[in-house]
Amino acid sequence: MAHKKGGGSSRNGRDSNAQRRGVKVYAGAPVRAGNILVRQVGSSIHAGHNVGTGRDFTLFALVDGVVTYEWKSNTKKQVSVYPAS
């Protein structure tokens, strides 16, 4: 058994690409239907009024309007889109 690891071997040098998750549109911003509001793992922010949920828990606007973030209960946050009138 060699007690040194051969000349050119390296065990490091790998890195995965960033997932680009997080809030994409903040409160008070205008959105169009279909715009992505939040990319997330699991439902840490829930879908409120006029907001849909994708297969990967992505939240998106169902109507044109203005984004608001509000507390659903003491522990759960939700995002809603209200039509601009």
Curated annotation (Swiss-Prot):
It comes from the Bacteria. Residues 1-22 are annotated as: Disordered. GO terms for molecular function: structural constituent of ribosome. InterPro entries: Ribosomal_bL27. GO terms for biological process: translation. Pfam families: Ribosomal_L27. The keyword Oxidoreductase does not apply. The keyword Ribosomal protein applies. Keywords: Ribonucleoprotein, Ribosomal protein. One of its GO terms (cellular component) is ribosome. Belongs to the bacterial ribosomal protein bL27 family. HAMAP family: Ribosomal_bL27 (MF_00539). PANTHER family: LARGE RIBOSOMAL SUBUNIT PROTEIN BL27M, RIBOSOMAL PROTEIN L27. This is Large ribosomal subunit protein bL27. It comes from Sorangium cellulosum (strain So ce56) (Polyangium cellulosum (strain So ce56)). The gene is rpmA.
